Regions:
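Concave beta-strand-loop units of leucine-rich repeat
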Residues: 1-13, 18-43, 48-121, 126-144, ...
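Substrate-binding/specificity loop regions of serine endopeptidase catalytic domains
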Residues: 148
Length: 317
């Protein structure tokens, strides 16, 4: 017999559950939310989603002791409204099966060990994809989203004091829908990344459009490893492109690649002391102005007029 769930189902503790919790035989109301809050060790070994298409939230912030691996497997849950995983501070790996969802949040996970995040099947996030405060400081954390093609509202990969030595979004093509993501202009970025800890180059090889503003932040000076930020297919950014930081100086990044860019609302680059060549922005110059072009505290700081005159820094190489 089917089990009828009310729109919101919550378990504050799971010690009474064991083995496999299979939702495939359950009937859920539209827009149902399944909220699992772990406060003690569970004997649950697997959570099967079946055709569940509501919201799944798993919170281990109060779980004691913290497990070093996910205490149960997660299967199914291919298409969801919202998916949120939080508070698994000691796990070293998190892999999720979801293919599409409205919003996806992963936060405060893997802060006590080198952390690997994998979303091997994820193709689309229709709203916001947020990864915040994950990974252990000073360790080789990594994130892989090999099939992700689009994020509808905002992609925010905010790692805080930690860093990711590898961030892979090889098929990502579009981010943003043109709607503001924050009332504060300082946080209104459709694409927000902190990739300066990446080994070698940070590259989004397939990204073509950002329907909003984008920030490539070098806030974390203690983990600067990336030597290049590359967006070789990026053609248009509806808002502002900001690269660097207003206060913290980065010395590792020497190359910027925006070679396909033909449209942008503004370009602001700061505190990249090893960057001296800005010829990559030549194609987009006609769409800019003196007010929408700013380079400060870099290895070379060309004005808009200098760029128009061909003094891009490439000639000094």
């Amino acid at each position: 017999a089917n089990i009828d769930f009310v729109p919101f189902a919550q378990w504050d503790d799971l010690p009474s559950l064991e083995g496999v919790l299979d939702l495939s035989g359950c009937t859920f109301s539209p827009n149902s939310t399944l909220d699992l809050r772990l406060v003690a060790a569970t004997r649950l070994t697997e959570l099967r989603g079946g055709d569940f298409g509501g919201s799944l939230r798993i919170d281990a912030s109060s779980l004691t002791p913290q497990p070093e691996a996910m205490p149960f497997g997660i299967t199914g849950f291919k298409n969801l409204d919202t998916l949120r995983i939080a508070g698994f501070t000691h796990i070293s790996e998190l892999s999720l099966p979801t293919e599409s969802c409205d919003d996806l949040t992963i936060e405060n996970c893997g802060s006590q060990a080198p952390f690997t995040l994998s979303l091997p099947n994820l193709v689309e996030v229709r709203g916001t994809l947020l990864c915040r405060n994950c990974g252990k400081t000073g360790e080789a954390n990594s994130g892989s989203l090999p099939r992700l093609k689009s994020v509808g509202r905002q992609l925010s990969f905010y790692v805080g004091a930690s860093s990711f030595t590898a961030l892979e979004f090889p098929l990502l093509e579009t981010v943003g829908n043109g709607e503001p993501v924050s009332d504060d202009p300082a946080d209104d970025y459709a694409l927000y990344t902190m990739p300066s800890g990446c080994a070698g180059e940070f590259i989004l090889p397939s990204l073509q459009r950002v329907n909003g503003s984008m920030l490539v932040s070098t806030w974390n000076t203690s983990t600067d490893r990336a030597v290049a930020f590359r967006f070789p297919s990026l053609q248009s950014v509806a808002g502002e492109i900001s690269v660097g930081h207003t206060a913290y100086k980065n010395r590792s990044v020497a190359t910027l690649d925006f070679s396909a860019l033909t449209a942008a609302g503004a370009i602001r680059i700061g505190n990249l002391s090893s960057v001296t060549d800005f010829s990559t922005f030549t194609q987009v110059l006609p769409r800019l102005s003196e007010q929408t072009w700013s380079v400060t505290d870099c290895g070379y700081n060309p004005t808009y007029q200098q760029m128009l005159d061909g003094e891009t820094g490439a000639e000094s190489k």
